[in-house]
Amino acid sequence: MTSQEHPNWLTALLVDTRPPPKLFAWSPANIQPKLDEGIDMGSSNSDEEYDNDACVCQSTDSDQRIYIIGPGNIGRLYATHMARHPNALPITLVVHRKELLSQWVACEGVGLADITSGKLFLNKGFTVEWWTETRPPYGPVKEVADGKKLHNVFISTKAEAGLAEADRIRRYLGRCSSVVFAQNGVCKLWPPHGPLYISHRYPSGDTPTFSACVVSHGVASAGPFLSVHAAPADAYIGPVFWASDPESPWRHPSDDFFIRHIATTPHVNTKQVSSGEIWLLQLEKLVMNAAINPLTALLRCKTGELFTSYGSDDPLALVIDKLLWQTSAVIQGLVDHKTSHSVITSYAEHMSQPGTSCSVPKVRKKLMERFSQPILKAKLGWEEDRDTGL
């Protein structure tokens, strides 16, 4: 692949030969030299549940700790319920602004209002850090993971910032690391660009496992460290890139500890799937992001309001149909492209019955139908036989 075929983000990283930066882990102690040991959490009632001890574990080693980078709505959802895991691990929330350290001190912790149960889950039992190249001028000086490797990393920033965050911390990533991207976007590490990026940024034999998590839960922000779980749904997690371990050649990405830990986290209904299936699920989520979400933002309405009119001459219906045709064409082009051969082959092998051979061309044809405009429209709740007028 020539440099002209590289996307801009990859070209910029390929020409970057600088070593990965050393990062300092600031804590609230670096903002306020002396903090009160106890923080008044107020009085609780029947609609509030406090989980201050849920994250307390004997070990604080980095190989046991979960690091949630970008604790926004999705990060807060998973942090809340990871803390309620039967085998809960210590959790560090990595914020993107220094000011959030002070806000953490002043707030009651991570709050998640569950609309279904009518409960407000509050948890102050997390460690909160801000990672920066700037050494703190006062307070304890601590490098990220004490200069060791991070094992369990959950990146829930906005999609466009996900890989940049992972690249910034690559000094602390290696073969022992499992990195999960949980965002409303397609992971950049799929072939053909992912393997090229990884071979450029990591030494051979010391590559992390990278996975993607597609989240369908409806979660809205209600303030710093506070979210509303408005629409419970489900989620899927699967591997994007993993390197075979010469010491354990029989190991499969489904054996990854962190993937299994997320899949067994209560109340978020996260299903573990194959690499090919998570690729397809990300593409399906892309349909919502490309055709529906921009319209709800532009028209300042809820998703359901887009489907109140089914008339063939309705201007909004025509716009949505046009967007779906364009989105379908792009995704079908990707499915049919030679660079997608490896992931489609992996998906075909996973879907084939034991003892039978898989037909990649047949699987590719079915996937082309899966992402056709009529099927996409049906999945969005529209009538397939409606005249589009296009």
Curated annotation (Swiss-Prot):
UniProt entry keywords in alphabetical sequence: NADP, Oxidoreductase
Activity modulation: The reductase activity is increased by Mg(2+) (195%), Ca(2+) (169%) and slightly increased by K(+) (123%). The reduction activity is inhibited by Fe(2+) and Co(2+), and almost totally inhibited by Cu(2+), Mn(2+), Zn(2+) and Fe(3+) (from 3% to 9% residual activity respectively). The chelating agent EDTA had little effect, suggesting Mg(2+) and Ca(2+) are not determining factors, though they could promote the reductase enzyme activity.
Residues binding substrate: 289, 293
GO molecular function, a single term: 2-dehydropantoate 2-reductase activity
Tagged with keyword Oxidoreductase: yes
Noted pH dependence of activity: Optimum pH is 7.5.
EC number(s) per entry: 1.2.7.-
Enzyme class: oxidoreductase
Described function: Ketoisovalerate reductase; part of the gene cluster that mediates the biosynthesis of beauvericin (BEA), a non-ribosomal cyclic hexadepsipeptide that shows antibiotic, antifungal, insecticidal, and cancer cell antiproliferative and antihaptotactic activity. Ketoisovalerate reductase BEA2 catalyzes the NADPH-specific reduction of ketoisovaleric acid to hydroxyisovalerate, a precursor for beauvericin biosynthesis.
Entry protein name: Ketoisovalerate reductase BEA2
Species name: Gibberella intermedia
